């Protein structure tokens, strides 16, 4: 089966907005063992849309079309599909009623232009959009099925999961001999990882791919065919031996997702005190439902006074060692843990930049501590000073990995490769 994607919209084509839908879609389908083999972006011009629908429908088996289903004059995907196939547009009575009910429930008067969203090519199969007013639909044209979705990200993603993936599986054999394994890494760049893994001789039908999503690089091991699948365990063993501590999670999108799962299963609690990360640790954790079962509190103690008054950091510790120090961050972690008698206290304090660094503590210097009921683990690391956001996100990731390793009973302080460490 050959899957393709057509993205529509002048703002996407002109780079005025980043097309996150396309990247998300390709990654989501890869998780299903289905590769998106081509992606085309086209603007809001009727003749261009017609041309690309005709061209790609001769090559692909199924095409997901994203965008252009709204009520405005530049939403042209539906009209273009009808013209490409030589069909008229027909009002779908079910969707018209859905629109009228939706506006009635919201207490709003429906503008006449919204009825455009109920017009579909005459051969189209209506596809439900459970969270929006733009009607999805599917059309068989030449050799391909074209499946139309709205551009609004949360509508698009829900339709992919609830409508598109089942649609594909009903019509195509996607249970073929494919398998995917993913490894989330920390502390090494994409080129460094690739140089290391190039030493592995891959069997026919197996490929290694890389996806950068700072502060992580995701490695994807993709196998096609029984022969390649049978050798996945062998290749995975080689990958783990070569990368060692750089691998921080399997089949997860982020370290926060891994930490969330581990804490939910462990029945243990966490308090967090953040300075340079500014709430990033807690923000990532509470994006997951159920985080209240383990997260006691998140404190952003940015100034020295708050470190003293809220966390109980000794003034003399700050005077002697400074805010960015092992001594200070250990007291922050212990103080955060003690407030609610949490099982763990996690703390960060650093210099995110671009200003504030010194010769002894340059930008990118970050102290991190993990307090447990038995003691405290701490380290002061040297991070690349490319941007403030990168320092904060890398600090968050290292803090998460310290906690992950403690939860798994592993060594908490480890070397990652490109992340340096100050001697205590």
Swiss-Prot record:
Gene3D superfamilies: CinA-like, MoaB/Mog-like domain. InterPro entries: CinA (IPR050101), CinA-like_C (IPR036653), CinA_C (IPR008136), Competence-induced_CinA (IPR008135), MoaB/Mog-like_dom_sf (IPR036425), MoaB/Mog_dom (IPR001453). Pfam families: CinA (PF02464), MoCF_biosynth (PF00994). SMART domains: MoCF_biosynth. Belongs to the CinA family. HAMAP family: CinA_B. This is CinA-like protein. The lineage of its organism: Bacteria, Pseudomonadati, Pseudomonadota, Gammaproteobacteria, Alteromonadales.
């Amino acid at each position: 089966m050959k899957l393709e994607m057509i993205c529509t919209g002048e703002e996407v084509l002109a780079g005025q907005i980043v097309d996150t839908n396309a990247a998300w879609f390709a990654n989501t389908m890869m998780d299903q063992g289905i590769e998106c083999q081509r992606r085309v972006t086209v603007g809001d011009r009727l003749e261009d849309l017609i041309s690309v629908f005709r061209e790609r429908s001769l090559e692909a088996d199924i095409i997901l079309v994203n965008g252009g289903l709204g009520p405005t004059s530049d939403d042209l995907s539906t009209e273009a599909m009808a013209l490409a196939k030589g069909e008229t547009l027909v009002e779908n009575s079910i969707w018209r009623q859905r629109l009228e009910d939706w506006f009635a429930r919201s207490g709003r008067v429906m503008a006449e232009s919204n009825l455009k969203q109920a017009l579909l090519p005459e051969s189209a199969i209506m596809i439900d959009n459970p969270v929006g007013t733009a009607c999805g639909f599917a059309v068989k044209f030449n050799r391909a099925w074209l499946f139309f979705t709205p551009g609004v990200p949360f509508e698009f993603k829900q339709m992919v999961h609830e409508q598109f993936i089942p649609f594909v599986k009903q019509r195509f054999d996607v249970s073929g001999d494919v398998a995917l394994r993913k490894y989330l890494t920390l502390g090494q760049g994409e080129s460094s990882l690739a140089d290391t893994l190039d030493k592995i001789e891959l069997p026919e039908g197996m490929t290694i791919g890389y996806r950068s999503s700072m502060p992580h690089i995701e490695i994807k091991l993709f196998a096609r065919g029984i022969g390649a699948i049978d050798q996945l365990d062998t290749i995975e063993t080689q990958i783990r031996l070569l990368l060692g501590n750089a691998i921080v999670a399997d089949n997860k999108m982020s370290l926060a997702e891994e930490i969330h799962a581990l804490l939910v299963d462990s029945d243990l609690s966490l308090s967090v005190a953040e300075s340079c990360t500014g709430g990033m640790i807690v923000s990532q954790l509470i994006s997951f439902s159920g985080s209240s079962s383990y997260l006691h509190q998140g404190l952003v103690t940015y100034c020295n006074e708050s470190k003293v008054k809220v966390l109980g950091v000794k003034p003399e510790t700050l005077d002697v060692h400074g805010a960015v120090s092992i001594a200070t961050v250990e007291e922050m972690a212990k103080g955060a843990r003690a407030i609610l008698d949490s099982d763990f206290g996690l703390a960060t304090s650093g210099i995110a930049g671009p200003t504030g660094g010194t010769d002894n503590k340059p930008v990118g210097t970050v102290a991190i501590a993990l307090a447990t009921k038995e003691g405290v683990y701490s380290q002061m690391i040297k991070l690349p000073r490319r941007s403030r956001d990168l320092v904060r996100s890398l600090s968050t990731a290292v803090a998460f990995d310290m906690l992950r390793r403690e939860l798994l009973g592993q060594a908490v302080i480890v070397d990652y490769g490109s992340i340096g460490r100050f001697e205590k």
